[in-house]
């Protein structure tokens, strides 16, 4: 069953068409990729899925229901979480505190409970802390839990952003260039981590990534867009042998 489906999705900014008729499907517990050259519209697609942008036409279906028109926080509550190409951590907060912020969108205690039911609020905070520690253990970040986020290595910051996304209990995890800035060893570890996340948390993953070795090695299905338009969809082998993809994207690697 498809957990996410984009049906002929188009996004226009005035007279500019950034995304034009994209169709995409992600099955439950599947790892998929969306690829294309810089400016192809990949992040715009992510922004439409997460409610940062509203679609001009078409539909975004999550868990069998349209989420078009929903606000970003509503989409998080429904079970979609994302990371960003440019890391967006709370740099002066600790590693543990960063993950705990992800749980706060799911907590039930509001201002009334903070004032009149302080014990319940503190109990919920303690539960969030323990769950955050579990995520840090899972990602191998427990040893740096008390450090400020800005003081941990870049690769760890990437993992921390994934950890914060996991704290929202997603059914679909969107990763926007998760390997950007990582060295070859960190990229290998990232591949294993993404697979482990999928298997442990029983979620689907859709990633945008320029590292083709990583994409081809981890993705079960790949969608390719060029100048906002879809040009191919299939397995890694099918994409690698697709003439349109080679001409528009993969074939450029030798020149770059």
Language-model segments: what does each one mean?
Residues 1-256:
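Glycine-rich phosphate-binding loops of nucleotide-dependent enzymes
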């Amino acid at each position: 069953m498809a957990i996410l489906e984009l049906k002929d999705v188009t996004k226009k900014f005035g007279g500019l068409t950034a995304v034009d008729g994209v169709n995409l499907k992600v099955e439950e517990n599947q790892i998929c990729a969306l690829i294309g050259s810089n400016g192809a519209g990949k992040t715009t697609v992510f922004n439409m899925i997460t409610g940062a942008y509203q679609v001009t036409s078409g539909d975004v279906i999550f868990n069998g229901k349209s989420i078009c028109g929903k606000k970003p926080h509503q989409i998080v509550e429904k079970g979609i979480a994302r990371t960003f190409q440019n890391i967006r951590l709370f740099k002066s907060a600790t590693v543990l505190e960063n993950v705990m912020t992800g749980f706060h969108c799911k907590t039930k205690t509001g201002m009334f409970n903070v004032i009149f039911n302080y014990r319940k609020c503190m109990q919920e905070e303690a539960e969030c802390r323990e769950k955050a520690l579990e995520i840090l253990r899972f990602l191998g970040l427990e040893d740096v839990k008390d450090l400020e986020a800005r003081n941990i290595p870049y690769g760890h910051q990437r993992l921390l952003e994934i950890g914060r996304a996991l704290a929202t209990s997603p059914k679909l995890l969107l990763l926007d260039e998760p390997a950007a800035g990582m060295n070859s060893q960190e990229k290998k570890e990232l591949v294993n981590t993404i697979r482990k996340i999928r298997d442990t948390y029983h979620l689907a993953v859709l990633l945008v990534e320029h590292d083709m070795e990583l994409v081809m090695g981890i993705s079960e299905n790949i969608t390719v867009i060029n100048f906002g338009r879809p040009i191919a969809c299939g397995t890694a082998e099918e994409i690698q042998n697709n003439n349109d993809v080679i001409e528009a994207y993969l074939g450029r690697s030798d020149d770059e």
